[in-house]
């Protein structure tokens, strides 16, 4: 079902101008934390413009929210429903600092996942059962009836049971060997996926592996309990911290976290002599009125980001002088899947990674998207940049299209978008 957006109403007027300024401030702050190459002195973002072309939005599914959206991010007892309804306050400096730390840890985790081949934008992986437990073939998606892999019955896909969605993580194994939505895909089955061994046999095998030699390389050896303990310690250290945005408040960073876990982390996975550096993750109780919508978003418009880069010249001596280069980033296009969840006065928004995007909308959409020129799920298919050095006054020469600078800026824009907006990172708004 297609959704018409009044793009002019959303992006113009006082609210639209204020939102554009917040986005400019956010991108500028991100560039200040980037390690610059030797030939660049600094980057300053000047303006951000939404443009006049609206994205195409198509509703694909209505289901239960992702488990991460239920995480209780309050440090005190203010996580009750009554406090949720009356909460208007912004984050403290300590909470913002904690959120920044979590974002950095999540970025490192995303780099490791990409290095291991679990997230490939240009060549999305085929969904076979070679990865344990992994995503299965999309051919049987209608029979399985997953809220993300298609349904065979009318009505609301995925049903109204939040608990089946939430409790599925206990039977989904450890998230290091599967995509975030793979566990969700098998949540409705009593024993998980049909070809999945029983959890008791799996845990027994893991215990036996702990007594074997660890001489294999990291890419070949199985997942042994010491490695699982390391993952659990990392998950414990990643203390949840919400980033919220009221209608009239300032924007904060997105929430970033590890894979979905149960309400507490088993104590047997931690070392006896080591205490966790932060309390275990807490989750709110799901309610029947909680709702999540899955959208396919296509965009090829004229969003514009203007910034200045100072280039250092090494003649006649190193870093002799800096020359400002004006860059205009435009022509952005992407085709991806977005998730918007509404839970107790909070709206959670994020995009899905390519492998999760294919799982969310099914095999038919995958084939249809591939024939349209852009690969669905591969966010930011194209970004164009225009660069100029010098002035056009009085017949002076102008140097255009500085290759290295353009490449660096485009890489950073793509990295910021994927790190901050792609699940498991997500944004939370107070509504």
Curated annotation (Swiss-Prot):
Domain of life: Eukaryota
InterPro entries noted in UniProt: Mdm12, MMM1_dom, SMP_LBD
Pfam families with a match to the protein in the record: MMM1
Domain SMP-LTD: 1-431
Keyword Membrane: yes
Record's compositionally biased regions (Acidic residues): 69-96
Subunit structure: Component of the ER-mitochondria encounter structure (ERMES) or MDM complex, composed of mmm1, mdm10, mdm12 and mdm34. A mmm1 homodimer associates with one molecule of mdm12 on each side in a pairwise head-to-tail manner, and the SMP-LTD domains of mmm1 and mdm12 generate a continuous hydrophobic tunnel for phospholipid trafficking.
Protein name, UniProt field: Mitochondrial distribution and morphology protein 12
Organism of provenance: Sclerotinia sclerotiorum (strain ATCC 18683 / 1980 / Ss-1) (White mold)
Gene: mdm12
């Amino acid at each position: 079902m297609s959704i018409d957006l009044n793009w002019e109403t959303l992006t113009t007027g006082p609210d639209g101008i204020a939102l554009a300024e917040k986005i400019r401030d956010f991108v500028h702050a991100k560039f200040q934390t980037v390690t610059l190459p030797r030939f660049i002195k600094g980057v300053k973002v000047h303006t951000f413009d939404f443009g006049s072309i609206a994205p195409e939005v198509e509703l694909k599914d209505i289901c239960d929210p992702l488990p991460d959206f239920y995480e209780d991010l309050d440090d005190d007892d203010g996580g009750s429903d009554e406090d949720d309804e009356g909460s208007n306050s912004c984050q403290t400096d300590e909470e913002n600092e904690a959120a920044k730390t979590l974002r950095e840890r999540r970025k490192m985790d995303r780099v490791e996942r990409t290095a291991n081949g679990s997230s490939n934008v240009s060549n999305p992986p085929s969904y076979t059962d070679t990865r344990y437990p992994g995503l299965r073939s999309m051919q049987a998606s209608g029979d399985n009836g997953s809220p993300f892999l298609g349904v065979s019955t009318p009505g609301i896909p995925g049903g109204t049971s939040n608990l089946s969605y939430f409790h599925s993580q206990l039977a989904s194994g450890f998230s290091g060997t599967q995509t975030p939505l793979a566990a969700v895909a098998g949540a409705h089955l009593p024993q998980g996926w049909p070809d999945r061994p029983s959890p008791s046999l799996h845990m027994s095998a893991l215990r036996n592996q702990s007594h074997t030699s660890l001489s294999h390389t990291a890419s070949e050896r199985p997942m042994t309990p010491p490695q699982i303990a390391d993952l659990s310690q990392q998950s414990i250290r990643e203390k949840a911290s919400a980033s919220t945005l009221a209608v009239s408040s300032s924007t904060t960073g997105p929430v970033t976290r590890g894979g979905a876990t149960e309400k507490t982390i088993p104590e047997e996975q931690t070392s006896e002599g080591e205490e966790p550096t932060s309390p275990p993750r807490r989750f709110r109780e799901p309610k029947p009125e909680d709702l999540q919508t899955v959208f396919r978003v296509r965009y090829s418009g004229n969003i514009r980001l203007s910034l200045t880069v100072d280039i250092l010249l090494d003649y006649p001596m190193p870093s002799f002088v800096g020359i400002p280069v004006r860059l205009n980033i435009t022509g952005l296009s992407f085709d991806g899947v977005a998730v918007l969840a509404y839970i107790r006065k909070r709206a959670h928004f994020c995009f899905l990674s390519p492998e999760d995007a294919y799982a969310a909308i099914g095999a038919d959409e995958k084939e249809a998207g591939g024939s349209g020129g852009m690969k669905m799920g591969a966010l930011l298919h194209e970004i164009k940049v225009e660069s100029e050095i010098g002035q056009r006054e009085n017949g002076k020469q102008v140097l255009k299209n500085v290759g290295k600078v353009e490449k660096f800026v485009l890489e950073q824009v793509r990295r910021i978008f994927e790190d901050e907006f792609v699940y498991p990172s997500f944004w939370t708004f107070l509504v």
